Amino acid sequence: MNPTPKPMTFSYDHWLGNYKVLLIFMVVFGHLIETFRNLDGNDPVQIVYNIIYLLHMPAFIFMSGYFFKEVRPKRIFSFVVLYFIWQSIHEVYLAYVNEKTVDGLVDGLLHPLVPSWTLWYLLGIIIWQIVTPGFLTLRYPLLISIAFALLINANPGSITNFLSLQKVISFYPFFLMGYLVKERGWLADGRIRDRMTSPIGRLTGLLVSVSIAIAMAIWTKNGFDTVWLFYRDTYGEFDVPVLKGALIQLFLYAVSTVMIFSVLMMIPHRSFGGRFDQIGIQTLAIYLLHSFIVRLFRDSVPPWIAESPVLLIGSSFLLALFFVWILSSRPVVRLFRPLLSSNVNWLFKKTS
């Protein structure tokens, strides 16, 4: 994900780029409907939300791992600077809308390592890039990453919000999986990719994806707790035994993994034009900017829309399309470029 505009080149992978477009749309769409999913009569909203969350962050993080190349200190530090910039912006914004005192604002600014809402992902990118080389020296890196995720959630009490470690560790297997898939060349041009994007492959992806969506809808109607998909609470907080909690988490890992590939199989691999491709390039910019628009949307939705599943889902869907299109535009990215791309060259010694 690159927050600065750049021209398309022949090396741009339209198949994976189109997938990123879908995923960032799902991120925005899911956040738009999030607040209203628990309102009376909004069961369809809850179902749509759960289906989105079963896929969008696991797949988004999978793609981040897929495009991870190597540990580059400058890149890591640029994400660190980016995180502190946006964490400060969030704190100032929240202090304003919540009418916090100056002391409240200062207190928030002095606790920057408890990320605000969506910013846990930036911390995740930083930590995942740092630890991945170490995991790759292990014989079974993916299995060990899953074991770590199960262990941290087996803690009987609540885990600290510091660095959003629980979410970062719990989602790490998807990042590592993305990297390992790339290393094995499974999604590169070749036999596997040809089979995945063949008519039979696309039909298979459609049938599997629809089946999972229907199953999630049924599970939601039967009391599935959406919070499981956030990977932020321990088994103890769900009041379930460790073994049952671990099995649920493993099951969700498996279903999300299947859905990552089944949805990918349906994605067109042709270009829809440079402007559409620009969305895939600007996913990080959209991710960072959309949270403020979403908050404004939540505060301004009239009750007659919020309490109507059809109107809420329909309007949120159209607004998500609009926001993704606008936030990825060159004028918007150019306007916010100082906040989207941090130059950290001054931190490093000059090499001769």
Language model regions located:
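Alpha-helical transmembrane segments and their immediate juxtamembrane cytosolic regions
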Residues: M1-S352
